[in-house]
């Protein structure tokens, strides 16, 4: 699994570059295209005949600088890979939702599922996996805030990036 996770991370960065090269502006990426392509790639990689996992994507069509789009895509990659690997154990179906929206000057990424969720002893931030470490590092890099919620069934991750603040150097 380590190798397939690494491949997914590299593909995530590759999608940003592919999306950039399809436009005439090489410094920003269309988030809707990027997020949809990334989600479809991960869905294809984890699709099995034993499970029917629905993945819905609702992403706004704004542009983002490449140096912010890459970490955002890597966060989404880690969340989706973890969801496919852990949320639907011993289940033959499930739902994953990815929403990317603007609220005032904030870009908000929400990834939720109706899987098995976390127990209180499995608080996501306390898990010392490579994927969780990557997520926390990238959230810090984006100067964002994150929140995991789980009520025993399903998990929701929210990332808020203040675009006004993140543009200040």
Segments from the language model and where they lie:
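Detector for a conserved hydrophobic position within an alpha-helical segment of the HATPase_c
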Residues: 139-140
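Short beta-strand/loop element within the Bergerat-fold HATPase_c
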Residues: 93-105
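Conserved short strand/loop->alpha-helix "switch" segment adjacent to the catalytic nucleotide/phosphoryl-transfer site
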Residues: 26-29, 47-80, 84-95
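Glycine-rich ATP-binding loops of the HATPase_c
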Residues: 143-151
């Amino acid at each position: 699994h380590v190798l397939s996770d690494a491949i997914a991370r590299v593909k995530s960065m590759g999608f940003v570059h592919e999306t950039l090269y399809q436009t005439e502006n090489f410094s920003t990426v269309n988030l809707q295209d990027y997020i949809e392509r990334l989600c479809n790639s991960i869905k294809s990689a984890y699709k099995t005949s034993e499970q029917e996992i629905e993945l819905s994507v609702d992403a706004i069509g704004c542009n983002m600088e490449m140096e912010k789009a890459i970490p955002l895509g890597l966060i989404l990659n880690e969340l989706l890979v973890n969801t496919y690997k852990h949320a639907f154990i011993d289940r033959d179906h499930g739902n994953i939702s990815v929403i990317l929206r603007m609220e005032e000057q904030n870009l908000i990424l929400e990834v939720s599922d109706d899987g098995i969720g976390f127990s209180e002893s499995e608080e996501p931030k306390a898990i010392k996996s490579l994927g969780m470490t990557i997520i926390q590092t990238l959230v810090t890099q984006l100067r964002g805030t994150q929140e995991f919620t789980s009520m025993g069934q399903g998990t929701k991750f929210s990332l808020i990036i203040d675009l006004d603040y993140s543009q200040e150097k």
